[in-house]
Regions:
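N-terminal domain-onset segments
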Residues: 1-85, 94-95, 207-209, 218-230
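Interaction-surface and assembly-scaffold signal
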Residues: 6-24, 117-230
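A generic structural signal for solvent-exposed, polar alpha-helical segments
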Residues: 40, 49, 81, 89, ...
């Protein structure tokens, strides 16, 4: 994907890029794979009909939506440096396996915005962040017409985790491509209080309230090049 195509990456209205952001974008970004280290607060909620509506039609038609995953992430080490991120992903059961698709993602790094859109067709937009993804702390993100915040309360000791997940995104050339994310780290089980405000549909599917989740103290993951999915 070229830099001229980044605006064609589909997402929810909160992921749209305004003229000022488009004018400030770098022409390129480091290619996949990206090897990253991060800390995060994540939460899981039941998928509503609005979650299916948030997906690109080709991904929506590929399976049954089963859950929504939200996250506030602080990237400590990436090919474009450190940055913060908020995201909403929808899990879809496709041919007996779950895969996630991301209709909403925002960062405070122009280089990450371009890299996400060019390498994985992730609809990254620009946001401002406060706080940290840690137990007892509130991390907030705000963009044009929207705001998301998450406050986590942990219980129990940290648990080592090693996970693999499939990311499926529709690309502007009409192809659904997948990447398999490999990660390992440690997490504390948590309850996460989420607030979502938007002039658009974001709160209809990335729902506010108290959700089951986790605080990830530090994790490393590899996100490889996207390839045409099954």
């Amino acid at each position: 994907m070229t830099s001229m195509d980044v605006r064609a990456v589909p997402g929810v209205p909160e992921s749209e890029l305004d003229a000022a952001t488009l004018a400030a974008l770098p022409d390129s970004a480091p290619p996949a794979p990206w090897d990253c280290a991060c800390s995060a607060v994540v939460w899981v909620a039941r998928a509503t009909p609005a979650a299916a509506d948030a997906l690109h039609p080709d991904i929506r038609a590929s399976g049954r939506t089963v859950a929504v995953v939200g996250a506030m992430v602080r990237y400590l080490d990436t090919p474009v440096g450190s940055y913060d991120e908020v995201l909403g992903a929808v899990a879809v059961l496709h041919r007996g396996r779950a895969r996630g698709s991301v209709p909403f993602m925002a960062v405070d790094s122009l280089a990450s915005l371009v890299g996400g859109r060019m390498n994985w067709s992730l609809p990254k937009s620009l946001a401002e962040f406060t706080g940290a993804p840690a137990a007892g702390s509130t991390m907030s993100a705000s963009g044009a017409g929207w705001r998301v915040s998450a406050t986590a309360r942990t219980g129990g000791p940290a648990v080592p985790v090693k996970l693999a997940g499939r990311l499926a995104q529709w690309w502007p050339d009409g192809i659904v491509r997948e990447s398999v994310l490999q990660s390992k780290g440690s997490m504390h089980p948590a309850l996460v209080r989420v607030e979502v405000e938007s002039t658009g549909p974001l709160a209809d599917w990335l729902r506010p309230g108290l959700h089951v989740g986790a605080v990830i103290e530090r994790a490393k993951f590899l996100l490889p090049e996207a390839t045409e999915g099954a």
